[in-house]
Amino acid sequence: MEQLKKIISNIPHEIKIIRPLKKGLISEIYLCNFNNIKSVIRLDLETPDWIKIQRDSEIRILDLNNNHKSEKNILYHDLEKGILIRRFIEGNKFNLNKINSDQQLELLGRAIKEIHKTNYEKDAINNFSNAINRYKEILKYKIQKDPILEIGFKMYEDLNHESYPKVFSHNDLTQENIIWNRKYVFIDWEYAGLNNPLFDIASIISSYSLNDQQIDSLWRGYGKKSDVDDAILRKWIKFTYFCDYIWRICLIETSIYDEKFLNLDDLKKNLSIFYKFV
């Protein structure tokens, strides 16, 4: 708490911490008042350079988003000190309600489509391939010793050569990053950038374990089912699990965390079922 007070005291604005919201692997998040605006402050823990690069990308994305809105969402940031303050978004983490799941998923599909229609200058935003290449560089001495890494990177190489046009994508559509309050709001944009649109769709499918009927509802909202090769989509779904593993191994290699802390054994067991199908 003393460290938190010290950080707050060096921010040239009036800030009052209300309560902690979340402590993650790389950051702590608090509800606060910032100049009498209900807000969220995210304080990065000691983070490796590859995460700082993604934070820089997030700030640029949020600044671009600010330019498209009359009311600014991002209120303050200091990349060097790992500080981000944004308006608090009212709502709840989106949980799939089985009673209304078809309607919910159609609306979610439409919301994802709106992300993918966003038109930013290509040189202003990150490219997902750059992130994968950074992971590959970090893990270059481990890939040949770890079949999961080898399969994961090879799978991405194959998928990245598919003919789908790259679009602006969120690239981290997990349950933690989707909020519902009469519409969908997406948070945590540090991985956002140009990517195959199927990665966002696949992330939703794997995160919520959607069945075929639910996937059809998601596509109805998105409006592109007829153009999609189901085999390619299934491969992207598999890749989301490998991507999670790659990210965790990068964190282990560059931070204080170990395999046990990051529950790597459970993820390895889940990934093992894919080996014979890759």
Regions inferred by a protein language model and the residue ranges of each:
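Conserved N-terminal boundary motif of the eukaryotic protein kinase catalytic domain
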Residues: 12-20
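A general structural signal marking secondary-structure boundaries and capping sites
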Residues: 69, 112, 116-120, 159-160, ...
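An alpha-helical support segment within catalytic cores of ATP-dependent transferases
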Residues: 1-12, 118-171, 175, 265-275
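Active-site acidic catalytic loop and adjacent metal/ATP-binding pocket
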Residues: 28-33, 40-41, 156-199, 213
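Short, charged, amphipathic alpha-helical segments
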Residues: 258-265
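Glycine-rich, phosphate-binding/catalytic loops in enzymes
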Residues: 58-59, 102-103, 185, 202-205, ...
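Active-site activation/catalytic loop segments of kinase-like enzymes and analogous catalytic loops
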Residues: 198-226, 238-256, 269
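ATP-binding pocket architecture of kinase catalytic cores
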Residues: 19-125
